Structures are given as structure tokens and as C-alpha cells.
UniProtKB/Swiss-Prot annotation:
One GO CC term, this protein: plasma membrane
Compartment(s) where it occurs, according to its Swiss-Prot or TrEMBL record: Cell membrane
Name of this chain's protein: Divalent metal cation transporter MntH
Pfam families reported for this sequence: Nramp
Keyword Glycoprotein attached: no
UniProt organism field: Staphylococcus aureus (strain bovine RF122 / ET3-1)
Residues spanning the membrane: 34-54, 61-81, 108-128, 141-161, 170-190, 212-232, 263-283, 305-325, 361-381, 383-403, 422-442
Protein's GO biological process: iron ion transmembrane transport
GO molecular function, a single term: cadmium ion transmembrane transporter activity
Family indicated by similarity: Belongs to the NRAMP family.
Recorded topology in the membrane: Multi-pass membrane protein
Length: 450
């Protein structure tokens, strides 16, 4: 990576929200924290999107609480990587897409852009599928109609944006806590064994020695670090009004943005643990092989003998509501990430509504085509979701490596470059994640062919 300085005519990242939310570095720590509370919520959404649900609940259903340790390690890794994106955005005034385009040669940057766009589409496919299935479960709306309805989310986002970025953060936060409280309630009703849950956070050798557990563990790790989140976070932290030329204010902004990120990712960690605990407490040692998708989980909850007819109906309905909330949340953040990638790599100046409509349409089209070919077969649609998650694994190194190279560059980052211990941990994470993702991709295609 060369050391060209940031050009003065660089377009602001997400310029309609950039530098719009007040941050007073002279205020109390409480006020500073509240000023920066919000971007982490949008990032946390990617760690509990519909694409993560199946892996966590299947892991619990098939292997009990063993994989809670993997969720813990994955979440801690995510916190480190997201803190690096915070420093990149605040220290340089560029998001990850802008930085990649600006500091890499044009041919390489174009390759990275194509992969980033495909990753955004893959992310959006999971949200479209999750929302369409939730609408089908709740209101019996055909899957094709449900997928088309999700296009309207784009215009809803445009409408909300007129009232400021804080409104988006508030709506996302409300939906996140809706999902959180639903699963707290469902786990409470399912009565898990506390000692067994706590034991799950201790590493077990079976995670490595048992191929089945290892496969699910890789799925959890691969689904935890989402490429679009790295682009998103490096942009939306710039929505606050800290001085772009004062290192003291930048330092404070980095501090409170990182605290915000870690708090929200802790909530995502709890949600993923709750999903696994719910799967383990209700389905471990029974029906685990039948929990292949959202419909299987919905009907398993509805007919679970331990719950009874009334509570089973409530639990399954709440599951569908949480799925819809998660899908809508991820729709908002995925659309924003699509805008960041398109603007950052291409410097395209097109109307916001058109840019967001293009992003969503590119995700809806493959879902509609798949539904048409397979005549609404839910299993085939859920298989498309699996393919989308596999592609995210392929795309991951193409944003992690530029992030690492940029944040370890003293000329680019100034006093906010990575310390040695951060470089050691982050490079180790990148290498391990890349190896595990390659293994996961190979295993997934072998299973699909088998």
C-alpha cells in the first residue's frame, strides 16, 4: 500500500449524514458517550442477522452448549476488528471503501470493488429471504410477494433519513431490543440448565476433534465478521461533529465510538448466546437433525411437547416477529453499506433513492428468480441463503487485509496507527479466519454435492 496523502477533493463518506450529529469535546464524559451512542447499534445488527440464526440454533440443538465458547471468541475478535474500522474512519476521514480505492492501484481496486458489491448483495439476499419467510409465517404472504415487499424498505429508509440519522439509530435500537427481549423470554420459558450453560464458555477439545462440531464452529466464526460491517462502521462514525484537524478531539471520538461499539457488540453476543441456548435447551438430543431452516425451527417451536400448545404457538409467533425485526434491521444497514461501497469505490453521484433501489434490486432479483424456478420451494430458498453466507466467507479477506494495512500505516493514521500487539493479534485473526473460511467453503460445497 503506497503512502499517498488523502486528496482534498475526496467526497465525504455518506455526505448527507457526515458531520451532522453534535459532539462537544468539552462536555462531560456522560454527554460525550451519549453523543456517540448509536453507530454501534447499526454495526451490531450484522452480528445477529437472519444469516446467523440457523448456525447458532443448529449448534445448540446438535451439540448442546459446547459452542458458546466459540461465540465468545468470535465476539471478542469482532470487537477488535470493529475498533480498527473506528480508528480508520475518524483518523483519516475516509471510509474503508474510499481508502481501498485511494491507496491501491486502479485494477486491484476495481477487483476489490466487485467483490465488495457482491458481498453487499449476498448480505442483502439473507435479509430479503429472512423478511420474506417471516411475512409468510406471520401473515401467510407468498414468498415472492414478501420478497417484493422488501423493496419498499428502501423508500422507508429514504423517508426516515429526512428526519436525521438519529432517527435511524433509534429505530434500529428499538428493533434490536425487540429481538433481545423476545429471546430472553423464550430462553426463560425453555428453562436451560445454568451450570451447563456456564460450562459452555469453557473451551472443549471436542470443538477441534469432532468434525461435526468443528463444522458448526466454523460456520459461527465465518458468519460473525461481516464484510459490509467494516465498510459501514468506518463511515457512520464520521456522522459526529468532532474536529477533523484536532488530534485531541479525534482521540476522544475514537474512545467513545469504541465504547459504543463494544457495548452494542456485547448485546449481539448475548443474542447469539440466547439463540444457541434456546436450541440446546429445547432440542438437544431430540429432533436436532430436522432443524435445517427457519420453517423447521418455527414448526419445532410450535409443536415442542415441553412447551404445550398455547406456549408453543406464542413462542413460534415471537420467533417469526424477531426474524422480521432482524431482517428489517439488516435491510437498513445493508442498504447504507451498499451506498458507502458504491460511492467510495466509484465516486458515483446519483440520487439517493436510485442508488439504494439499485442495491436492493440486485439482491431481490436472484431471490425472485430462485422462487420462480423452484415454485416457492422454501428449502431451495434457504439453500440460496447458505450460498450467500459462503460467499461472505470468500469476500472477508478482501476487506480485512486492506483494513489491517491501512491501520498499521503511520503515514496514513498518524498517532492512531496500530500498536504492535494489535498488529500481532489482528494478523493472527486474519490468517486464522481466512484458513477457517476456506475450510468452511470446501466443506459446504462437499455437503451440497453430497
Amino acid at each position: 500500500m503506497n503512502n499517498k496523502r488523502h486528496s482534498t477533493n475526496e467526497q465525504l463518506s455518506l455526505d448527507e449524514i457526515n458531520n451532522t450529529i453534535k459532539f462537544d469535546h468539552r462536555s462531560s464524559n456522560k454527554q460525550k458517550f451519549l453523543s456517540f451512542l448509536g453507530p454501534g447499534l447499526l454495526v451490531a445488527v450484522g452480528y445477529m442477522d437472519p444469516g446467523n440464526w440457523i448456525t447458532s440454533m443448529q449448534g445448540g440443538a446438535q451439540y448442546g452448549y459446547t459452542l458458546l465458547f466459540v461465540i465468545l471468541i468470535s465476539s471478542l475478535s469482532a470487537m477488535l476488528l470493529q475498533s480498527m474500522t473506528v480508528r480508520l474512519g475518524i483518523a483519516t476521514g475516509m471510509d474503508l471503501a474510499q481508502m481501498t480505492r485511494h491507496y491501491l492501484s486502479r485494477p486491484i481496486a476495481i477487483i476489490f470493488w466487485i467483490i465488495a458489491e457482491l458481498a453487499i448483495i449476498a448480505t442483502d439476499i439473507a435479509e430479503v429471504i429472512g423478511s420474506a419467510i417471516a411475512l409468510n409465517l406471520l401473515f401467510n404472504i407468498p414468498l415472492i410477494v414478501g420478497a417484493l415487499i422488501t423493496v419498499l424498505d428502501v423508500f422507508l429508509l429514504l423517508f426516515i433519513m429526512k428526519y436525521g440519522f438519529r432517527k435511524i439509530e433509534a429505530i434500529v435500537g428499538t428493533l434490536i431490543f425487540t429481538v433481545l427481549f423476545i429471546f430472553i423470554f423464550e430462553v426463560y420459558i425453555s428453562s436451560p440448565q445454568l451450570n451447563a450453560v456456564l460450562n459452555g464458555f469453557i473451551p472443549h477439545s471436542e470443538i477441534i476433534t469432532n468434525n461435526g462440531i468443528l463444522y458448526i464452529a466454523l460456520g459461527i466464526i465465518g458468519a460473525t465478521i461481516m464484510p459490509h460491517n467494516l465498510y459501514l462502521h468506518s463511515s457512520i462514525v464520521q456522522s459526529r461533529t468532532y474536529s477533523r484537524h484536532n488530534n485531541e478531539e479525534k482521540s476522544q471520538a475514537i474512545k467513545f465510538a469504541t465504547i459504543d461499539s463494544n457495548i452494542q457488540l456485547s448485546i449481539a453476543f448475548v443474542v447469539n448466546c440466547l439463540l444457541l441456548v434456546l436450541g440446546a435447551s429445547l432440542f438437544f438430543n431430540s429432533n436436532a437433525d430436522d432443524l435445517g431452516g427457519f420453517y423447521d425451527l418455527y414448526h419445532a417451536l410450535k409443536t415442542e411437547p415441553v412447551l404445550g400448545a398455547t406456549m408453543g404457538a406464542i413462542m413460534s409467533t415471537l420467533f417469526a416477529v424477531a426474524l422480521l425485526a432482524s431482517g428489517q434491521n439488516s435491510t437498513i444497514t445493508g442498504t447504507l453499506a451498499g451506498q458507502i461501497v458504491m460511492e467510495g469505490f466509484l465516486r458515483l453521484h446519483i440520487p439517493n433513492w436510485l442508488r439504494r433501489l439499485i442495491t436492493r434490486s440486485l439482491a431481490v432479483i436472484p431471490v425472485i428468480v430462485c422462487l420462480s424456478i423452484f415454485k416457492g420451494n422454501a428449502a431451495k430458498i434457504e439453500q440460496l441463503l447458505v450460498f450467500s453466507q459462503v460467499f461472505l466467507s470468500i469476500a472477508l479477506p478482501f476487506c480485512l487485509i486492506p483494513l489491517q494495512l491501512a491501520t498499521s500505516n503511520k503515514d496514513l493514521m498518524g498517532p492512531f496507527y496500530n500498536k504492535t500487539w494489535v498488529n500481532i493479534i489482528s494478523w493472527t485473526l486474519i490468517i486464522i479466519l481466512s484458513i477457517l473460511n476456506v475450510y468452511l467453503i470446501v466443506q459446504t460445497f462437499q455437503e451440497l454435492q453430497g
